[in-house]
Amino acid sequence: MRFMQRSKDSLAKWLSAILPVVIVGLVGLFAVTVIRDYGRETAAARQTLLEKGSVLIRALESGSRVGMGMRMHHAQQQALLEEMAGQPGVRWFAVTDEQGTIVMHSNSGMVGKQLYSPQEMQQLHPGDEEVWRRIDSADGEPVLEIYRQFQPMFAAGMHRMRHMQQYAATPQAIFIAFDASNIVSAEDREQRNTLIILFALATVLLASVLSFFWYRRYLRSRQLLQDEMKRKEKLVALGHLAAGVAHEIRNPLSSIKGLAKYFAERAPAGGEAHQLAQVMAKEADRLNRVVSELLELVKPTHLALQAVDLNTLINHSLQLVSQDANCREIQLRFTANDTLPEIQADPDRLTQVLLNLYLNAIQAIGQHGVISVTASESGAGVKISVTDSGKGIAADQLEAIFTPYFTTKAEGTGLGLAVVHNIVEQHGGTIQVASLEGKGARFTLWLPVNITRKDPQG
């Protein structure tokens, strides 16, 4: 079962790592495809008009060429142009001289007027190749205009005739304008569809990213829950052990301590026997203290709740360690926060928590350093931070820092922070640690203003 659970956890972690990459890759590929295809419909609609315009221009040139060979009058050529301009979608069809004066126009009333000024004709500079542009007509409607030089003079094998000299001497330009509403509609449709698709892709991408972080958070919370369950199971085991150990060890310890004091009183002061008896008594006290701490860790915690002024409590707790801190030239810093609300807590237990953190900080600093305490309102509770300038905690030790019997010091039982964690938890709060090795540590407590009493057995 454990192997299967580990396999599922490994698969979940692998999927949580690889799925976002796959989704982002697919979304990116789809987005590139959408962007690459953008404008194809518009280009196709525009190409259709360009081909149609080219055919009409060549047809007019061909008709004019045949007409010149047959000495067709200008009125007949004008009629030919008007006939061709009747094609669907044609807004106007015109031939101008190099100054922009209209020679022929689909609207005969425009003949002799200026289609474009000489300056505009110089800018347009009609050549042998057809050129297109998007403009707005006089009525504000979009049109696609195609223009180039008007070349009705020659076809393959055709010789210039005398009556054609007037056409050769006067360069002319031909303009044909199509209704561009289809192109505009295609552009709007493509833009709208592209925006919808990109928005959908962005939504999928955002949902994937959020799901990734949510799932990682879920895995982490599940891991924390599993760790907490293991810790509680360990505490239960310690409770059973402590119940037996306390009875079996404390009675012999009392006898050993009594005998040690008896021998110390009987032995000559300063002698070896006297010193050994004192060592026995001290070790008996130390072992008794370890048993007491073990019992305190695992036994149900009874909280004597009352309204607590944190400013007063923190100042009082700092005074208790001030002498030890002064001896080591360690500064204790705390500025009272008048905006702090009173909280429901057990002042003795809370003082025990702070003292434990202070003493750990003093031991981590050794000599010459600073311990800073801050308190502030945080949501529906208060936050207390204890920061020291000590040697810090290694990254691989942070997760186990609240585990019973885990210690980074040569001395100590490793139960102090476990007791702190237990007391804070019984208050309905949380405790976190942040540290960089060699740069000190910060323990942050969060305690609710009003707590819900917990069943000590739970």
UniProtKB/Swiss-Prot annotation:
<dbReference type="Pfam" id="PF00512">
    <property type="entry name" value="HisKA"/>
</dbReference>
<keyword id="KW-0812">Transmembrane</keyword>
<dbReference type="GO" id="GO:0005524">
    <property type="term" value="F:ATP binding"/>
</dbReference>
<feature type="topological domain" description="Periplasmic">
    <location>
        <begin position="36"/>
        <end position="194"/>
    </location>
</feature>
<keyword id="KW-0418">Kinase</keyword>
<dbReference type="InterPro" id="IPR003661">
    <property type="entry name" value="HisK_dim/P_dom"/>
</dbReference>
<dbReference type="InterPro" id="IPR036097">
    <property type="entry name" value="HisK_dim/P_sf"/>
</dbReference>
<dbReference type="GO" id="GO:0000155">
    <property type="term" value="F:phosphorelay sensor kinase activity"/>
</dbReference>
<dbReference type="GO" id="GO:0005886">
    <property type="term" value="C:plasma membrane"/>
</dbReference>
<keyword id="KW-0597">Phosphoprotein</keyword>
<dbReference type="Pfam" id="PF02518">
    <property type="entry name" value="HATPase_c"/>
</dbReference>
<feature type="topological domain" description="Cytoplasmic">
    <location>
        <begin position="216"/>
        <end position="458"/>
    </location>
</feature>
<feature type="transmembrane region" description="Helical">
    <location>
        <begin position="195"/>
        <end position="215"/>
    </location>
</feature>
<keyword id="KW-0547">Nucleotide-binding</keyword>
<keyword id="KW-1003">Cell membrane</keyword>
<keyword id="KW-0808">Transferase</keyword>
<keyword id="KW-0902">Two-component regulatory system</keyword>
<dbReference type="InterPro" id="IPR005467">
    <property type="entry name" value="His_kinase_dom"/>
</dbReference>
<comment type="function">
    <text>Part of the Zra signaling pathway, an envelope stress response (ESR) system composed of the periplasmic accessory protein ZraP, the histidine kinase ZraS and the transcriptional regulator ZraR. The ZraPSR system contributes to antibiotic resistance and is important for membrane integrity in the presence of membrane-targeting biocides. ZraS is a member of the two-component regulatory system ZraS/ZraR. Functions as a membrane-associated sensor kinase that phosphorylates ZraR in response to high concentrations of Zn(2+) or Pb(2+) in the medium.</text>
</comment>
<keyword id="KW-0472">Membrane</keyword>
<feature type="domain" description="Histidine kinase">
    <location>
        <begin position="244"/>
        <end position="451"/>
    </location>
</feature>
<keyword id="KW-0346">Stress response</keyword>
<dbReference type="InterPro" id="IPR036890">
    <property type="entry name" value="HATPase_C_sf"/>
</dbReference>
<keyword id="KW-0862">Zinc</keyword>
<feature type="transmembrane region" description="Helical">
    <location>
        <begin position="15"/>
        <end position="35"/>
    </location>
</feature>
<keyword id="KW-1133">Transmembrane helix</keyword>
<protein>
    <recommendedName>
        <fullName>Sensor histidine kinase ZraS</fullName>
        <ecNumber>2.7.13.3</ecNumber>
    </recommendedName>
</protein>
<dbReference type="InterPro" id="IPR004358">
    <property type="entry name" value="Sig_transdc_His_kin-like_C"/>
</dbReference>
<dbReference type="InterPro" id="IPR029151">
    <property type="entry name" value="Sensor-like_sf"/>
</dbReference>
<keyword id="KW-0067">ATP-binding</keyword>
<feature type="topological domain" description="Cytoplasmic">
    <location>
        <begin position="1"/>
        <end position="14"/>
    </location>
</feature>
<keyword id="KW-0997">Cell inner membrane</keyword>
<feature type="modified residue" description="Phosphohistidine; by autocatalysis">
    <location>
        <position position="247"/>
    </location>
</feature>
